[in-house]
């Protein structure tokens, strides 16, 4: 392969120029993440590991541990140049530099030459994710990994138009499980819909997105993991498999490239590295990593949890309290103390059933997303939802950007608005639109109008009517 790329699993891609590995993205070589919940769908081969080790450049999209996998980075030679998006807070830059790597922050929308025929551009965004654009010869590869577009759709569409459609590729997440799914009612009964009810819509949305961007090829990426903790294996049926994509893909003019493939950008041909897409289920354990669900918090430890929640002034407008259930002991932490006089049925809150060690690690390091994505924690919703406020505010703005107060949030918003005003409005309008559609679905179901409205909406966006 003179010029091309290969997919190694999850979000790791390796780009080649003249048969030489030039760039590896989000290297996760072995081990687990999310408190031992996720493992690689299949272990890397020695050749795949060697390709990552030989690449001169490493690009890290964001701070989630399946992308920024510290144990994997520690295995790489320190002569690498690590490229990073221009994220709001320098924590990732500083931590990787402290490991001994040379670190370069890629300015927004500026090309960086990596080899004679390969150059790259990075688009950081307010979700604290990063999108990588790689030009290799006369081909263009957009690595969305698991980032939302965040107002970059217009820019990417105009960029992709400059290339032969057959030579444009978008590598993207296609998954429903890479976020909190483990919702329960007050009796502890899981309330998430069956997998088949959720998978189709996700696959349709990805197909629609790739088509709208104008790309000719979809590369399945950032989705190849398996749940291996005893208390998270229940989520494995919710993983979107390649068979699911084959069954429900709705844009036949967009070529699908399955996981674990090598793509020759000179010819456009690709070949599979494995005869099947079988997951390495032998990695599944009967253990819960470092957690003991019966362990309780001490008084000092409860105080640490309380102080962690109190840091988030940005939550006050949207939530009254958070409940934590640890070792069968339930405690309420008030976000709005003035709400104590309200009737319970009017309060807005979220309850988390969570083991001690993972909770304390989350409180110490501040990355609440990790405990949500692991899907071993159970979540109760009381007149509240995780989106559009809780997860973005506590996990993205708080954990990644270190934005906790309303004034800090205003400064944060100004940064992204000034850089791309139109994209900023488009992205925020899309979020309000999604919230509005959720209300429409809720009311249409109660008024008996769900079916006709669904038919109209799906015809408007070009999805199947089923």
Where are these regions (language model features)?
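Active-site-proximal loop/helix segment associated with metal-binding centers of metalloenzymes
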Residues: 27-32, 37, 123-138, 147, ...
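Feature captures hydrophobic
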Residues: 263-466
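Active-site HxH/HxHxD metal-binding segment of metal-dependent hydrolases
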Residues: 44-110
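Catalytic core of the metallo-beta-lactamase
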Residues: 8-19, 112-166
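Active-site neighborhood of phospho(di)ester-bond hydrolases with catalytic His/Asp-centered motifs
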Residues: 24-26, 54-68, 83-86, 142-147, ...
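Metallo-beta-lactamase
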Residues: 84-139, 247
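Pre-active-site segment of Zn-dependent metallo-hydrolases
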Residues: 20-63, 70-75, 149-165, 342-343, ...
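Cap/insert and terminal regions of metallo-dependent hydrolase folds
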Residues: 155-250
